[in-house]
Amino acid sequence: MATTELPKFELLSLADNTSGWGPLTTSSSSVEPVPFQQFNKADRIGRVADWIGVDRFFRRGNERYNERVYGSAANAGSQFDYIHGMDEHNFQLVDTSKPMARNPQRNFRVRQMHLRKMMQKEVEKREMVNQTTNLRMKRSIAKEQQRAFKMWQRRGGNARQGQRGQGGRFGGDRPKERLPSVQVRPEWGVLEEMNLSAFSKLALPNIPGGEDIGDHQYGSLQYYDKTVDRVSVKNSVPLQRCAGVYYNVTTTEDPVIQELAQGGVGNVFGTDIILATLMTAPRSVYSWDIVAYRIGDKLFFDKRNTKDILNPVETLTVSETSAEPPSFDGNGLNNARDLATEAFYINQNFRRQVVKRNEPGFTFKNVRVPFEDEETGDATGTAYKYRKWNLGNGVDGKPVELVCRTELDGVIHGLGNETQTLTIKAFNEWDSSQAGGVDWRTKLDVQKGAVMATEIKNNSAKVAKWTLQALLAGSDTMKLGYVSRNNARSTQNHSILNTQYVKPTEFASNIALNMDNCWGILRCVIDSCMKQKPGKYLLMKDPQSPVIRLYSLPEGTFDSERESSEEENSDDDQ
């Protein structure tokens, strides 16, 4: 068996410098062709000592830029340095900018959404421009119905709900004490109580429109001044004090109604404001009373003669149906009585100011008003039309024919120069910080619909009466004005801030005024009175609850008040 020999390991011979220290002056031939390059500045390979550049150790600052210190790049050789040549044959420009990441699908969707929004805004803008005031007011119908329901609850509609308060919740606030329109005397007997909440379910459909009675149209009207339509908050007009006569003639004192009753025309008689008060009874909050005379087979709805300018039926209430109506006997200017008087003077002056008083007007068949004062002969600025309606058969089987005295306030030229009749009314702003009002001077020009909705909410009963008066008179258009105090603490000076046209039929729909329901309420009251024997009766709205009570009055009741008022009027004339 052959044995294998391992290679021998031989150590290289080390050169020994016997003549001194340090490396030999001559190197081995095996390492001469190998270049040396210091790859790391921290390599401990270099000179052991440098006795030549001693003066460089004394340099300071920037003078030491070329100093070869340990670990400096100056100690490295240049064997592996890159030397840039001038060869530009292979030179290329490289774009080092970062490319933007694009999502074309996303950009398309964004542009499409933006376009849709722009188109939607354009459509909404056109709708707002083309939308009339009547359409905008329809948005307030739901709020109006909700408010009416809350008011019904607040007035005791939910009294049977256990311990719940009048506000429909536990611990609700009690209703404010309201005064009755007339003090009920012990000798007055209660014949019937009519719940106003049940009136909302009544309906008398298919009542034809009113018919003018012969030539019984009296007075003359002035044409409306269309320059008033340019009035705005920025271009307001001071409310002038216009002279004129206001006639407050009751039903039984009207000579035309007396003539018609004697001539057998109609069997139920009343004025437009009295009938409107009965037909809008569920909306009223304050107390009012109407005298009913049952004479033979005829019924007269009349009002009491009071010492005040206006009867509670004719009072232009202010913020009656608001959440916090003004009190009757409050101190200052903003009590209910003074506000109603202020509203009366505002309406009288407004309806005279907005017509052309110095120009020829429109004259009816009878120029002279039947109850006009022969001595003064002052024009009232109001025309009177006597109209009649057929309300079907009554409780006795005979037809119920209603005769009503209606009022018109002006005329205007319509399409084709046709003369149209006007009913002119005015809202009055007293203090926007009270009774849930809004500041007209900031919102009226830009949000007239919101201001109108607020007025309908706070004055539901008054607005409904105005609308019914226009419908009973057959008025073509209603002209509504917005009159505000110049100073909230003074009732002396006012300004007209804006005006507005509405059609009575459309406006009635906007305020949820159903004529079938109104005729049903009136017919119910007529039937209740016609069931009684001939005599004198009183219909009074309870001040605290939604109830109308029918009282029987002894003979001679209220006659002393009428005599005293007539004596005062005669003393004033003297």
Swiss-Prot record:
Q: Which GO terms describe its biological process?
A: cap-dependent translational initiation; formation of cytoplasmic translation initiation complex; translational initiation
| Keyword check for Calcium | no
Sorted alphabetically, the Gene Ontology cellular component annotations on this record are: eukaryotic 43S preinitiation complex; eukaryotic 48S preinitiation complex; eukaryotic translation initiation factor 3 complex
Disulphide bonds in the chain: none
- Annotated spans, RNA gate: 312-326
- The UniProt annotation puts the region (Disordered) at 153-178, 555-574
Q: Where is the composition biased (Low complexity)?
A: 154-163
Keywords attached to this entry: Cytoplasm, Initiation factor, Protein biosynthesis, RNA-binding
Ranges of compositional bias, category Acidic residues:
564-574
User: By its UniProt entry, which Pfam families does this protein fall under?
Assistant: eIF-3_zeta
The record's listing under InterPro entries reads: eIF3d
Give compartment(s).
Cytoplasm
Predominant cellular place of this UniProt entry's protein? cytoplasm
MF-aspect GO terms: mRNA cap binding; translation initiation factor activity
Q: What does this protein's UniProt record list under function?
A: mRNA cap-binding component of the eukaryotic translation initiation factor 3 (eIF-3) complex, which is involved in protein synthesis of a specialized repertoire of mRNAs and, together with other initiation factors, stimulates binding of mRNA and methionyl-tRNAi to the 40S ribosome. The eIF-3 complex specifically targets and initiates translation of a subset of mRNAs involved in cell proliferation. In the eIF-3 complex, eif3d specifically recognizes and binds the 7-methylguanosine cap of a subset of mRNAs.
Comment, domains: The RNA gate region regulates mRNA cap recognition to prevent promiscuous mRNA-binding before assembly of eif3d into the full eukaryotic translation initiation factor 3 (eIF-3) complex.
Q: How does it assemble?
A: Component of the eukaryotic translation initiation factor 3 (eIF-3) complex.
Into which family does the record put it?
A: Belongs to the eIF-3 subunit D family.
Which PANTHER family does this entry report, sorted A to Z? EUKARYOTIC TRANSLATION INITIATION FACTOR 3 SUBUNIT 7, EUKARYOTIC TRANSLATION INITIATION FACTOR 3 SUBUNIT D
Cited HAMAP family: eIF3d (MF_03003)
Q: What is this protein called?
A: Eukaryotic translation initiation factor 3 subunit D
Species of the source: Caenorhabditis briggsae
- Gene name per UniProt: eif-3.D
